Amino acid sequence: QKVVGIDLGTTNSAVAAMEGGKPTIVTNAEGQRT
């Protein structure tokens, strides 16, 4: 089972995926997490 979490903030947003039982923030093309 794969889990993805999305935080839709008013200024920034973030996406995390579960890897090995720990959440990992997905970075954009510039390497930023927002």
UniProtKB/Swiss-Prot annotation:
Q: What does this protein do?
A: Interacts with newly imported chloroplast proteins to assist in their maturation.
Keyword Ligase carried by entry: no
Q: Where in the cell is it found?
A: Plastid, Chloroplast stroma
Name this protein carries in UniProt: Stromal 70 kDa heat shock-related protein, chloroplastic
Give the UniProt keywords, A-Z. ATP-binding, Chloroplast, Nucleotide-binding, Plastid, Stress response
Q: Listed GO cellular component terms?
A: chloroplast stroma
Provide any one GO MF term from the record: ATP-dependent protein folding chaperone
Please give the InterPro entries that the UniProt record associates with this protein.
ATPase_NBD, Heat_shock_70_CS, Hsp_70_fam
Protein family? Belongs to the heat shock protein 70 family.
Q: What is the phylogenetic placement of the source species in the record?
A: Eukaryota, Viridiplantae, Streptophyta, Embryophyta, Tracheophyta
